[in-house]
């Protein structure tokens, strides 16, 4: 009985829908993609709007260092001038991507959905779905080029994702002090100068007799030097 129900559902899906594939491209131009780059980016697609059964969803990754990624078996509604809408989300662990959300509209031009066209639009926060056709002045979304592929790349003004951002920089990270501490050689030089300055005072505190002998030795050498010059 369960097998019969599954067969009927599958047959119903075939009658109502046709399936297609969609291919896009992930690019970090002018940088070439590496294995590490493509392993840290993901793409997801969700069917929205007009669907009969459970909305279609799928996740995919970049196939190779060419940057191509593919969604397979996207169901299209059959009928003349019938649309099927999807939304694509792109996420990366390293980069701020654009467009983050992509809206796809497939339009079928025959009863079998064999003749169809597809358009892509850049999406924004708060505009995750296509505007209702009954709205007189719907929001206009920017149409994206798909020649030869729909391209997803990084945001030029802020390419890298900042997981931690220091709001107020302290005195130790800016100015002269920050410049010194940013270089280990400058830091070592400053520490050496400080030690040379405070060393006599430390010795005098810890061992007054040794400090007195050191001062007498310095004075003796100065007197000998003065006598030699005369």
UniProtKB/Swiss-Prot annotation:
Compartments (UniProt record): Endoplasmic reticulum membrane
Topology relative to the membrane: Single-pass type I membrane protein
Tagged with keyword Protein transport: yes
UniProt keywords, alphabetically: Endoplasmic reticulum, Glycoprotein, Membrane, Protein transport, Signal, Transmembrane, Transmembrane helix, Transport
GO annotation (BP), single: protein transport
Domain of life: Eukaryota
Family that this chain belongs to: Belongs to the SOP4 family.
Ranges facing Lumenal side: 18-187
Chief location of this protein within or outside the cell: endoplasmic reticulum
Residue ranges crossing the lipid bilayer per the database entry: 188-208
Primary role: Involved in the export of PMA1, possibly through the monitoring or assisting of PMA1 folding and acquisition of competence to enter vesicles.
Pfam families cross-referenced by the UniProt entry: SOP4 (PF17081)
Signal peptide: 1-17
Glycosylated position list: 32, 50, 81, 115
Topological domains, Cytoplasmic: 209-230
GO CC annotation, single: endoplasmic reticulum membrane
Protein name as it appears in the record: Protein SOP4
Keyword Metal-binding: no
């Amino acid at each position: 009985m369960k097998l019969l129900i599954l067969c009927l559902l599958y047959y119903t899906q075939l009658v109502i829908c046709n399936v297609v594939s969609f291919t896009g491209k992930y690019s970090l131009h002018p940088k070439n993609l590496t294995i590490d780059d493509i392993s840290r980016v993901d793409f997801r697609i969700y069917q929205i709007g007009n669907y009969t059964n459970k909305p279609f969803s799928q996740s995919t990754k970049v196939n190779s260092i060419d940057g191509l990624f593919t969604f397979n078996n996207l169901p299209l509604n059959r009928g003349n001038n019938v649309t099927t809408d999807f939304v694509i989300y792109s996420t990366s662990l390293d980069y701020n991507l654009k467009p983050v959300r992509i809206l796809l509209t497939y339009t079928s031009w025959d009863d079998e959905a064999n003749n169809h066209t597809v358009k892509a639009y850049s999406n924004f926060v708060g505009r995750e779905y296509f505007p209702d056709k009954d709205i007189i002045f719907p929001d206009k979304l920017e149409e994206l080029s798909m020649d030869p592929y729909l391209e997803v790349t990084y945001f030029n003004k802020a390419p890298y994702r900042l997981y931690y951002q220091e709001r107020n920089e302290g005195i130790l990270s800016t100015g002269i002090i920050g410049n010194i501490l940013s270089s280990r050689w400058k830091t070592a030089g400053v520490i050496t100068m400080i030690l040379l300055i405070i060393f006599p005072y430390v010795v005098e505190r810890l061992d007054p007799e040794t400090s007195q002998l050191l001062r007498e030795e310095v004075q003796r050498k100065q007197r000998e030097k003065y006598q030699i010059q005369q």
